[in-house]
């Protein structure tokens, strides 16, 4: 077995991965706040951590992957007001758009995709524990976490409290005992979402959402917590504080993994700067696999400069790889050097370089190298289409909609997505997935606890 190494933000060094339970690796990744289409910067962690999960599944017998959806937030309230639609209409449509983008990018579906609004009781319970233990206090109908009570606060970001406050958008309100204290629960007016609680009608703060949901699905202490580097402070710092204090634990997660920014003209791509490009818009003239490849070309911790040329070059690279594996199907183990590269802190540039070496040898007649390349493609999440379809549709999003040659992995991904839709009572989406598979002559058979499929 290849030894997996990951850069741990908490320790500020590359560390060997030592799982809590090798029989079940547990990973939590911060998901989207659902008020708009995701942009290419949002897509980077989705793709990178998807590769990490694929590597983990290659190395270990079971991986429990949780990625949340934040569907209660002031940005959501404001956007619904601007569009003059209900909040549920906005969030349901945005979640559907998000799932469509993830499918186009070739991402696996997490085992659990909890929504914040379905876990309010768990959040209230955790807040009650923090108040009881003296880590939180009530002020002006708000519940706040007292950072002075947690002596390890600032350990993840490595900054002093003064630095963190001055360098962030922390709201310094007069009801706070300390400027760095953060909201666990806040009151809601009649025109915005709210839930009954011991502190009156209100809604949760952002940070408590992830603490409550990760605890429910992964427990007090799990292996990996992942997210963008912009989440280190305050989000992840605050998650650690409230989780450790509520759960009487020294660690929330053993490994904290963060990806770097995507830049446009040298600036971080973000919605606040308005210099972003949504995946939805990119798919009008490209395909998800080329976008995915683009996001794998730089090491995940380094900044990634993105532009139209980036996708064009990715498309050419994929064409070269598809040509090399023409006629081959996955049959056997992945190339050990590619797996070794990915096990070395998810070094996708090295893995892609190795893939192109194998393609060179395959194009010179080496069937062994062609087979190794095809066998390795699923770990990177590429080359899932037939070569014929790629060269027919690869320059457009039509390839994302062509299901005539759907493979087993794609079928299982769609079945899991349908399962999540049914759990979320989104029966319309569940029926759409069933109908999509039926067009490919795939018949689903639902049984208690499992869905089987067969070709008609």
Give the residues covered by each predicted segment.
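N-terminal, positively charged nucleic-acid-binding surface of large information/translation enzymes
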Residues: 11-14, 20-106, 444-446, 453
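Acidic carboxylate-rich catalytic motifs and surrounding loops in phosphoryl-/glycosyl-chemistry enzymes
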Residues: 67, 112-118, 142, 259
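Short catalytic-loop micro-motif centered on adjacent basic/acidic residues
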Residues: 110-114, 225-227, 363-367
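Short Gly/Ser/Thr- and Asp/Glu-enriched loop/turn motifs at secondary-structure junctions
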Residues: 109, 139-140, 446-450
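Alpha-helical recognition segments enriched in aromatics with Gly/Pro capping
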Residues: 1-35, 50, 121-330
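Structural preference for alpha-helix termini/caps and helix-kink/transition segments
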Residues: 268-456
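N-terminal, positively charged, Ser/Thr/Ala/Gly-biased leader segments
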Residues: 100-136
